[in-house]
């Protein structure tokens, strides 16, 4: 009511009275505006950051069935280790369908069942992940360049506080890749950079760049049907979560930063 009275007296008075009222009310509102601005700035700057460094490993096996020239299905099993290769991280079972829309454009749909290890004394958490991959490529000589867009949704089966994290986490991943085919060897070294951004993080945090991944690797054709892939990846991962006080207001933002060095090996077979 006080603000409404100030507004009415300020803009519905006339002449000199209006000027005096405007000056007086401005002096009253300035301290309030300054206090609100200071509080908002302090809230935005209240962020506590922790850092983690880890060496990790991934081992996988992929079985692909060609369905004609343009269609294929793949079953992939992957084991992930963390804490300097000393502890199980996750187990992925992924089923995918790929379709070559054009020689330069490929679309694929994926479902992954993820068994996530939550530490000693706790059961594995099962997660369901669905995503699409849309890949455009350009070839020139022995070089191949590609851009991949990947919208992804991960459903958590364990309880998730919606004020801290989304029960179904949506992200969008962008990957730019360069690959070179070494003539007469079956060897294809590659490098890529991938960015992951959140799409539905809690309002208290806001959407942000969640992960930056860079990778160097090589694919080697053992036979016409089998292949081996070896890679090194560096992940810089960010995880922002609100921490609440006793009054259920955001006390600060906990920001975990992880630097992960990953060695991976995959065997693939096509039939």
Please tell me what each predicted stretch does.
Residues 45-49, 71-85, 106-119, 149-155, ...:
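Transmembrane beta-strand segments that form the barrel wall of outer-membrane beta-barrel proteins
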Residues 131-137, 257-271:
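Outer-membrane beta-barrel "beta-signal"
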Residues 150-249, 270-271:
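Outer-membrane beta-barrel transmembrane domain signature
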Residues 28-39:
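Bacterial N-terminal signal peptides
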